[in-house]
């Protein structure tokens, strides 16, 4: 990521169609959104054309599907059928909807709110601080603050900046160099969430 005439960029690398390593500068979406306040259209690089895409009218007639995490954790012999049914439901819902609500996950609401607050705190930092608070994303794993899925100069881009981290088991340091140092309590809530969700 670098600054160029007060326009901020993520620097991404990819292999082009002829097998050459290329580097491209992609605008930082959060900063671009601040600059474009009052604009009523997206920059062309972020537009997608889907000529065969049908217009879908939003409907709230169907409830969002739910997956019961407690049922997925059942391992005792008499409860295999319940677990198998919930796994089948998960596969079906993921395929048909692409999203679902998880219930009975065991994570207290204060921990979930804490995660939300520290992530908002991170994305609320000035660009320079976000950039400085994570490791390099030149890694093969492409973790950290930046962009993902850039495969060519001319592809339409997603309207997103992302922060990707690995929740490594306690005692290892794999992937932990990309965990933000700011806000100072950033690590506490996601780490507790991971511990609560570990089976």
Regions found by a protein language model. Give the residues of each.
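Peripheral, non-catalytic segments flanking oxidoreductase cores
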Residues: 1-199
């Amino acid at each position: 990521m670098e600054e160029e005439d007060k326009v901020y960029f993520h620097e991404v690398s990819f292999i082009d169609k002829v097998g050459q390593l290329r580097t491209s500068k992609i605008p930082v979406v959060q900063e671009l959104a601040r600059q474009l306040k009052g604009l009523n259209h997206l920059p062309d690089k972020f537009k997608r054309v889907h000529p065969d895409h049908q217009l879908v009218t939003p409907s709230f007639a169907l409830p969002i599907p739910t997956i019961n995490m407690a049922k997925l954790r059942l391992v005792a012999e008499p409860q295999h059928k319940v677990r198998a049914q919930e796994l089948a439901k998960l596969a079906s819902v993921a395929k048909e909807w692409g999203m679902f609500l998880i219930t009975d996950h065991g994570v207290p609401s204060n921990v979930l709110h804490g995660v939300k607050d520290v992530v908002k705190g991170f994305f609320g930092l000035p660009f320079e601080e976000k950039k400085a608070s994570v490791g390099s994303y030149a890694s093969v794993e492409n973790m950290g603050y930046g962009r993902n899925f850039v495969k060519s100069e001319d592809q339409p881009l997603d309207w997103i900046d992302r922060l990707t981290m690995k929740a490594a088991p306690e005692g290892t340091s794999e992937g932990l160099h990309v965990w933000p140092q700011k806000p100072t309590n950033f690590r506490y809530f996601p780490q507790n969430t991971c511990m609560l969700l570990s089976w």
